[in-house]
Regions:
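Beta-strand/loop substructures that line and gate deep hydrophobic ligand-binding cavities in soluble
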Residues: 123-150
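N-terminal signal peptide c-region/cleavage motif recognized by signal peptidases
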Residues: 27-29
Length: 170
């Protein structure tokens, strides 16, 4: 009788695990479905959302961390452009806030480099977040256009879209 009880418990745990997995997949699919169509600008895909920069940035950081990823570097682009404006002769401030967050997935990068060791240049991945001085009510999130000639890059691009979808649904 103990054997049947143990098997029943194992099935119960398996059932809960499968249910949780199904819910997670459904959540990921619904997030992807909520992702608006990006505006394609040059080599970038740009998503725009109303809100405050710091709130959307916090949501972006959380979405990256929720994927189990660690931000390895933050490029403070607006600060750099402001700091170097005199030296470069810049007369117009384009961004109120602008950063690029860099991170990588060991699993995806391993797959990319296994198929082609030169794909290491595709890591780290980045998502830029910024507000334009001409449009302070909206926050922009942008990623590089997908590397269409790199079939292996599709998983990376899907990850970036998942992160943006999660950011926009907070």
């Amino acid at each position: 009788m103990k054997k049947h009880s143990r098997i029943a418990k194992q099935w119960a745990v398996l059932g809960k695990s499968l249910t949780l997995t199904a819910l997670m997949l459904a959540g990921a699919q619904s997030s992807a479905q909520l992702l608006p169509t990006p505006e394609v600008v040059g080599s970038s895909w740009v998503y725009k959302t109303p809100g405050l920069y710091h709130n959307v940035r916090d949501d972006l950081v959380q979405a990256i961390q929720d994927e189990g990823l660690v931000i390895s570097y933050t490029a403070h682009l607006a600060s750099m452009l402001t700091r170097t404006a005199e030296a470069t002769g810049a007369k117009v401030q384009v961004y109120e806030n602008a950063e690029s967050l860099l991170f990588c997935s060991a699993e995806l990068t391993y797959e990319l480099t296994l198929n082609n060791p030169h794909n290491i240049t595709l890591c780290p991945y980045s998502i830029s977040i910024y507000t334009l001085t001409t449009d302070l009510d909206n926050v922009h999130l942008s990623i590089r256009a997908p590397e269409l000639e790199q079939a292996d890059y599709a998983a990376v691009h899907q990850l970036l879209e998942q992160i943006i979808a999660a950011t926009l649904t907070w």
